[in-house]
Amino acid sequence: MKEIFLQISNRQDLSQDQVQAVFDRILKNEVSESQIASFLMGLKIKGETSDEITGIVRALKSHATVLPETFTDAMCNCGTGGDQSYSFNISTTACFVLAAGGIRMAKAGNRSISSKSGSADVLEVLGINVAASPEILSKALDEVGLAFIFAQTMHPAMRFIGPARQALGIPTIMNLVGPLANPLDLETQLMGLYRVELQEIVANTIQQLGRKRAVIITGPDNMDEAALYGTNTYTLLEDGHISQHTFTYEDLGMEKVELSDITGGDAKENAEILLSVLRNEASPYLETTVLNVGLGFFANGKAGTIKEGVELARQLIADGSALEKLRKLQEVQV
């Protein structure tokens, strides 16, 4: 590790092979917690590159648990977290609506690292087994069209990184890697990103990983979700081309919702918010959800525009389809 630390301290980027070799050692528990923390902090200070992110993703996928069935049409809408917005679990709520729209959702997630409640914490309150076996996950993806992919189950060696991440308590390259290291080879992706300046780097990584189409979204104040105030910036990967765009709530004909209106709470409180949205109860939470679902339908290609996606999201919530997806997942992912 000494040579690696020297290179990082000189602000020299690492190659994919170098990073993959380091993470192979980390995932075999051959690197101390203090060294892992130093490595993550060093990359953050230096600035992460596409090659470094890809190297970690490759290492994680090579150590990941494999599902017994192969799915080639799946999507994930997991974000990086780490935006310090303390909003409710937007992408977790949105995934049920996206699944109701006919998209096979392999929703990755974890327990809370830097917020009150991670997606795993909320789903656990709702009776979903976040530590379900690969066989059950395959069944859920097949029968429900939706499964929650718990990082600690599919990436058991991640337990060697967790303590260092918890000790640092700030976003690191692992926040970027998490949504990209889905054990399934995703066809499409919506990824929330807490730093707008990293969008192009992440888009290049996603392209290297073979995604057909993807959107990387950063909301106002560097939220890792789209929001109904200020300007949202997204990078679109489509047909091998990468382009950046912006939009506001006004562009979509929607009402303004301040960040303070979508604050979440602990896992139990966020589970109640999720249920209220899927029951179509009018609120800022509902409006923010349909915005992000609309963006998800656009990212997948199911909607030609974000506005069309928002309209589809409203229909799927209003007719109970999204709530039914939750009920079915509660029956299968147990």
Curated annotation (Swiss-Prot):
EC number, as in UniProt: 2.4.2.18
Binding site for anthranilate 1: 79, 110
Note on how the cofactor is bound: Binds 2 magnesium ions per monomer.
Cofactors named for this entry: Mg(2+)
Keywords: Amino-acid biosynthesis, Aromatic amino acid biosynthesis, Glycosyltransferase, Magnesium, Metal-binding, Transferase, Tryptophan biosynthesis
Matches recorded under Pfam families: Glycos_trans_3N, Glycos_transf_3
Known catalytic reactions: N-(5-phospho-beta-D-ribosyl)anthranilate + diphosphate = 5-phospho-alpha-D-ribose 1-diphosphate + anthranilate
Binding-site residues, Mg(2+) 2: 224-225
GO molecular function: anthranilate phosphoribosyltransferase activity; magnesium ion binding
Pathway terms, separated by semicolons: Amino-acid biosynthesis; L-tryptophan biosynthesis; L-tryptophan from chorismate: step 2/5
Entry annotated with the keyword Glycosyltransferase: yes
Residues that bind Mg(2+) 1: 91, 225
SUPFAM superfamilies, alphabetized: Nucleoside phosphorylase/phosphoribosyltransferase catalytic domain (SSF52418), Nucleoside phosphorylase/phosphoribosyltransferase N-terminal domain (SSF47648)
A GO biological-process term: L-tryptophan biosynthetic process
Coiled-coil annotated spans: none
Gene3D superfamilies: Nucleoside phosphorylase/phosphoribosyltransferase catalytic domain (3.40.1030.10), Transferase, Pyrimidine Nucleoside Phosphorylase, Chain C (1.20.970.10)
Binding, anthranilate 2: 165
One cellular component (GO) term of this entry: cytosol
Family (UniProt): Belongs to the anthranilate phosphoribosyltransferase family.
Stored PANTHER family: ANTHRANILATE PHOSPHORIBOSYLTRANSFERASE (PTHR43285:SF2)
Assembly and interaction partners: Homodimer.
Purpose: Catalyzes the transfer of the phosphoribosyl group of 5-phosphorylribose-1-pyrophosphate (PRPP) to anthranilate to yield N-(5'-phosphoribosyl)-anthranilate (PRA).
Protein name: Anthranilate phosphoribosyltransferase
The organism of origin for this protein: Streptococcus thermophilus (strain CNRZ 1066)
Lineage of the species this protein comes from: Bacteria, Bacillati, Bacillota, Bacilli, Lactobacillales
